């Protein structure tokens, strides 16, 4: 009997020891993961600071796709010495001034017809698969989300619509604070917002920032097509090729007139200088990654940058 008790006690001790060993190894693994994640955060944050330096060091009188800050997507910096697995830093700087400024759609309760028309033309392009009426309804819903009244605009929506949904909420009745607020607006689906294979994402073509003028040197091709009802795919391809291969002649907003004929763009809608940028820096090691993203405004006279918003994930 005593032998059986001893054997049982030994078995219990072995099980406990194995469990403690497993727990200890798990804690060590978790600690290593936490250490690497902290390191990745600082790697990504350093990349974000590097992006701001590149913007401050830009001395050109205009902004284009061939500048140092615009080609950071080609930069991959190894950080292997900091991690047990391969590590790297990736940096991308996007020109927010080349996108359509959503918050300029409304001034108080009045609609900005120039921005409205650009958005309708943008959403009406074949890549989005929407007809003109549907595109207009979505723009009206964005307008209703931002304006301060509760009057429904055409096919738009106010709080009366949103309060009838399974997860009820009210219309913002104020400027958009983050781009993913668009997903709360009537008519904007995940597919429209994010895009998919062969389809663009609305989030990549619009911005919360900007004074209302769009930089034609950096605007995505779909945004270029929305600048005029006469703009064609062929004309945009010519403009895109020219701005990627030309130099100083991109300083004037009217340079496009030398490349395409018979298409007029309102000069009040375009510029060749940019003030707002989005910096995205990724620190990665193995399957782990940390991204620091933020919006930055740059003063053209002092070349100083100011952080408007940022997040780490």
Residue ranges with predicted function:
Residues 1-313:
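Compositionally biased linear targeting/interaction segments
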């Amino acid at each position: 009997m005593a032998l059986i008790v001893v054997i049982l006690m030994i078995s219990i001790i072995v099980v406990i020891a194995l469990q403690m060993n497993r727990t200890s190894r798990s804690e060590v693994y978790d600690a290593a993961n936490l250490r690497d994640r902290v390191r990745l955060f600082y790697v990504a944050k350093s990349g974000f600071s590097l992006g701001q330096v590149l913007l401050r060091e830009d001395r050109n009188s205009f902004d284009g796709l061939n500048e140092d800050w615009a080609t950071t997507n080609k930069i991959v910096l190894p950080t292997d010495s900091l991690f047990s697995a391969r590590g790297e830093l990736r940096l991308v700087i996007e020109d927010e001034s080349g996108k359509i400024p959503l918050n300029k759609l409304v001034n108080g309760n009045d609609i900005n017809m120039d921005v409205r028309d650009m958005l309708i033309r943008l959403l009406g392009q074949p890549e989005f698969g929407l007809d003109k009426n549907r595109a207009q309804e979505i723009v009206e819903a964005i307008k209703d989300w931002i304006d301060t009244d509760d009057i429904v605009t055409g096919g738009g929506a106010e709080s009366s619509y949103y309060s009838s949904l399974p997860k009820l909420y009210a219309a913002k009745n104020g400027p958009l604070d983050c781009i993913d607020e668009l997903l709360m607006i009537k008519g904007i689906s995940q597919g429209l917002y994010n895009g998919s294979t062969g389809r663009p994402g609305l989030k990549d073509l619009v911005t919360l920032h900007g004074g209302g003028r769009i930089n034609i040197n950096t605007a995505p091709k779909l945004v270029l097509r929305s600048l005029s009802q006469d703009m064609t795919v062929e004309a945009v391809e010519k403009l895109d090729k020219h701005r990627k291969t030309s130099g100083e002649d991109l300083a004037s907003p009217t340079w496009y007139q030398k490349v395409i004929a018979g298409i007029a763009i309102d000069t009040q809608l375009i510029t060749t200088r940019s003030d707002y940028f989005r910096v995205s820096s990724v620190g990665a090691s193995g399957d782990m990654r940390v991204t620091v993203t933020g919006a930055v405004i740059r003063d053209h006279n002092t070349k100083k940058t100011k952080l408007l918003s940022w997040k780490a994930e």
